[in-house]
Amino acid sequence: MGSEMCIRDRNTGGKICFAQSKPVLQSPKKGDREARLFVTFRPTDKISDEVSTTSGYEYNSQNSIIASSGKSKYKFDIAQEDFAWISSNKIEKRIIKKMKKASRIMVTAYNKSGSQTIDHYSLMGFTKAYNSAKKNCT
């Protein structure tokens, strides 16, 4: 999955911890997109296991943002500008469980002009990064 970080929220002073990953493969290859996949913990706000993504551009509201691994698919049903979230904590728990077992996950999304992008994330090291983020923010 990549890495784990803990930071302080400048507004509340509360701790924010997250596991994050950069794509190992992107389609299309052209362009420099700052795509990421996150699982975040914000104890001050009573938020844990928050799954989010950014594809490095503002999303097209007419198309779905989907994470898929094997036969499992998960819809990011909240999108604001260049970030997307899953509104159901139950679904977030399912995707995290899948991320702990799988080796790869793909996020498919569409930019404002309707062009599709696919970001492939390795899940090697996800469980370690997730456990560390969770431990540091509880």
Q: Which residues does each PLM region occupy?
A:
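A generic "folded-domain core" signal
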Residues: 3-4, 8-138
